[in-house]
Structure formats: structure tokens, C-alpha cells
């Protein structure tokens, strides 16, 4: 999150760098994490505001995270949507590069459904904790202008929460702006250092993200099994993808019905499958729709085969001479 009174968009030319990094990162992955890609796309589209979504999404002036306005107007739009808005390209690119790395790590290890559930939960928790912190500071210390009336936007509060979750089990050390710290406490070091080097950064928003990550881990540890949000995400995912799965099943079913293509077999039985008959001359499996063997041309009607609905047809000879079989194959495929 960053604090700004007014203004928007300064700096440029960094979005191609973000696009190049995302493409390169996804290209090398055997499995492409879809939720991370969707979050990157959503944040970028909200910032760019292309013509096809510009009339639909609110302007940044309508979604600034401002505790005073949220409480005064009960404006939940500011509470949730402000996380997806950024004031300029450096702000967007820095956050999205961080999301790219953290998102891929977490989604790969957790799975898409659980990762989507976690992100959805952390957005609400980080924004909610920040709101409560601002209100508490107002009531306890009369901090009015400093936090309660500030304007902020950005995904960084959620990223701090994700960092806490990602590093919760780490036992090694990490470098934070050149300072070596235990990885599990890296978010706290980054909170202080970011505030030192980026004065406009929202200290309260980042702190709210860290606390949200800690609360999420505590709740997750005390609850066994899938949480309700994960179950809901999985249910919605199954519902949305049902038409695709249905069509995929139909395509596979049609492929299983062999239409004029078979295989050469050596089994003792002549029954190869539903609607399939095996040529006794060359043991090639043919579609039940064919009256002659596709491999050697032997006619099914002359007793050269088995089918699911009939046994071996009676014939005075079950095998053709080898020379005749070779001749028929040459004629068939020449």
C-alpha cells in the first residue's frame, strides 16, 4: 500500500519489464499457476483501464482506502477494491513482481483452490486489520490525521501477509535490502526498511498485512481439513468448469469409438472390443462398420473375422497364403 492525497500515474516504461518477467517465468514452468496469472492480469487491467472495462470499474478516487470514509459511509467498496489499484507504474510493477514470485511459490505448493481461498481471505483480513488499527489509534491516542484520514491503495498489504505465510516454516536466513535476517522474520525487517526508504508507503497497511498473515496461520493451524472458503472456491471452480469437463468427456468417448482405424493384434480370442472385429488373416482390428479388412482387404463376409455379436464365421480356410496376404497389403496401400 502507498499513501497519497491526490494524483495518479507517474513514471512509465516499466510495464514491458513486468510482462517479460511474467512470460519468462511462466514459460519455464511445467504447470502454469492460473490464480497467480489472474491476479497479475486483474491488477494490471485495473491500472491500464482499457476501453472495454473502463465504464465498469470505479475510478481510483472512489476506492481510496480511507478509514474515516469507510466508517462514515459504511463503504465496503473502498475496503476491498482499494487493494487492486495502484498510483503509478513503479508502484504496480514492484508489487506485481513480488506477487509473481510469491504467488507461484505458494500456488504450486498449495494448489489453486486453496491458494485462491487464501488470497481471498488475506485481502479481507489485511484490509480489516488495517481498518481496526486506524480506528484503535484514533480512539486510544487521538491519531487523527496520521492514519485515520490517510488515503492508500495497493496490493502490498496482501503481499506482506503472503510473505508471512510463505516464510512461516523457513529455518534459514534471507537478505532483506542487504541485511541478513532469519527468513521467518523477514517481513518485519522489510516493514521497517521499506518505511525508511519509501516514506509514502503505508506503514499501517503493511503492518495490517503482517498481522493478517499471522492470524491466518493461527486459524489454519487450529482447524483441520479444508476451510469453508476453500470448499466454496472448489465448488465454484467445479461449477464453472463443468461445461468444459462435459465436452472433454464427450470428445474422449468419441475417440474411444474407433472409426476405421485399428491395430495389429496377436491375441488368441477374436473379440477386441465393442463394435470391433479382428481379421483372421492379418489379425488387424477393424471398425464394426467396415465389411473388409482395412489392412489386407480380406472381406468380413467371407468368414474373416469375429465381432462382439457373432462368433467366428464358418469358413473352409482361416488363413490366406503368405504371398497372397503380402500382395493384398501392397494393393491396399499403394
From Swiss-Prot:
It comes from the Eukaryota. One of its GO terms (cellular component) is plasma membrane. Residues 1-87 form a transit peptide. PROSITE patterns: ZF_RANBP2_1, ZF_RANBP2_2. A zinc finger (RanBP2-type) spans 273-302. The gene is RBL14. SUPFAM superfamilies: Ran binding protein zinc finger-like, Rhomboid-like. One of its GO terms (molecular function) is serine-type endopeptidase activity. The lineage of its organism: Eukaryota, Viridiplantae, Streptophyta, Embryophyta, Tracheophyta. PANTHER family: RHOMBOID PROTEIN 2, RHOMBOID-RELATED PROTEIN. Probable rhomboid-type serine protease that catalyzes intramembrane proteolysis. May function in the heat-shock response pathway. It comes from Arabidopsis thaliana (Mouse-ear cress). The active site is at 156 (nucleophile), 206 (charge relay system). It is found in: Mitochondrion membrane. It is a multi-pass membrane protein. Keywords: Hydrolase, Membrane, Metal-binding, Mitochondrion, Protease, Transit peptide, Transmembrane, Transmembrane helix, Zinc, Zinc-finger. It is an enzyme of class 3 (hydrolase). This is Rhomboid-like protein 14, mitochondrial.
